[in-house]
């Protein structure tokens, strides 16, 4: 078990969990002319993220380590800025673009750590997650144009 990979995966798990929660808050609090489309899009995103964090946590367990748990521990590990509950729809989308971008950096770090030690299963999982978040960033940025 590589501690470097575990540390990177724990960061990815914490940030994925935080992003799921933030996206859920956006789903609850979005308002304005784009309400229906964003409300639906945010729901799709947080549901996908909750499935993803489970896969990431299970990968950590498969590597022989413990997945991060407890809201306090996850909050301490997560490197994402909080979103204001009363953010405008545009600000919500901008925030989620930035948060997905931060998570993309974490995913690429974890992918690279896995590649260095020949852990192709973890590398594949990180590549799949990178593809999801790149698409999400593209879609959110398209909304802002």
Task: Set out the residue ranges of the language-model regions.
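Helix-loop segments that flank and shape redox-cofactor active sites
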Residues: 1-4, 19-44, 106-121
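Conserved alpha-helical segments that form or flank metal/cofactor-binding pockets of metalloenzymes
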Residues: 34-73
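A structural signal for well-ordered alpha-helices, especially hydrophobic packing surfaces
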Residues: 13, 20, 27, 53, ...
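Acidic/histidine-rich alpha-helical segments that form the ligand environment
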Residues: 54, 58, 75-128
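DHp/HisKA dimerization-phosphoacceptor four-helix bundle of two-component histidine kinases
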Residues: 11-14, 18, 44-51, 95-98, ...
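Disorder-to-helix initiation segments
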Residues: 1-12, 82, 89-92
């Amino acid at each position: 078990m590589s501690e470097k990979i575990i540390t990177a995966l724990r960061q990815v798990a914490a940030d994925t969990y935080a992003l799921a929660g933030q996206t859920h808050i956006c789903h609850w609090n979005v308002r304005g002319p784009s309400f229906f489309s964003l409300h639906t899009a945010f729901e799709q995103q947080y549901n996908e993220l909750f499935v993803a964090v489970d896969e990431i946590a299970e990968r950590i367990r498969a590597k022989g380590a413990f997945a991060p748990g407890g809201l306090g521990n996850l909050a301490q590990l997560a490197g994402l800025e909080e979103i204001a509950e009363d953010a405008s729809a545009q600000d919500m989308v901008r925030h989620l673009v930035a948060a997905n971008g931060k998570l993309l950096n974490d995913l690429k770090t974890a992918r690279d750590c896995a590649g260095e030690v020949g852990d192709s299963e973890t590398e594949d999982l990180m590549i799949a997650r990178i593809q999801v978040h790149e698409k999400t960033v593209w879609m959110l940025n398209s909304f802002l144009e």
